């Protein structure tokens, strides 16, 4: 499997450590005012919430997904169980589309 091949597998868990897949970059298109995940021959425009999830849960500086969920729970003053369910679903989708890897 390469970076462009989607990985369909089990859901992302709170103990997982995620990083952007090889060849994927988080970029800000200042002209359009949009953040996006760019990969070879494809891109995904992120809304405000998706950007917050990627920043909180993906990258070498993030201990694990649980730490990102805790950060988002505090930042948005929302019930942790709801935040966790939404975040894990979004991250699993991003992984299945080949944008993030464990």
Give a label for each model feature.
Residues 1-55:
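Acidic, low-complexity/disordered tracts enriched in E/D and polar residues
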Residues 2, 42-102:
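Long, charge-rich, low-complexity alpha-helical segments
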């Amino acid at each position: 499997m390469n970076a462009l091949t989607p990985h369909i597998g089990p859901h992302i868990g709170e103990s997982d450590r995620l990083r952007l897949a090889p060849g994927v970059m988080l970029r800000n298109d200042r002209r359009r005012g949009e953040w996006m995940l760019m990969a070879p021959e494809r891109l995904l425009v992120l809304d405000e919430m998706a950007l917050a999830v990627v920043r909180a849960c993906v990258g070498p500086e993030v201990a694990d997904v649980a730490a990102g969920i805790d950060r988002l729970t505090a930042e948005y003053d929302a019930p942790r169980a709801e935040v966790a369910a939404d975040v894990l679903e979004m991250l699993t989708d991003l992984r299945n589309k080949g944008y993030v890897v464990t």
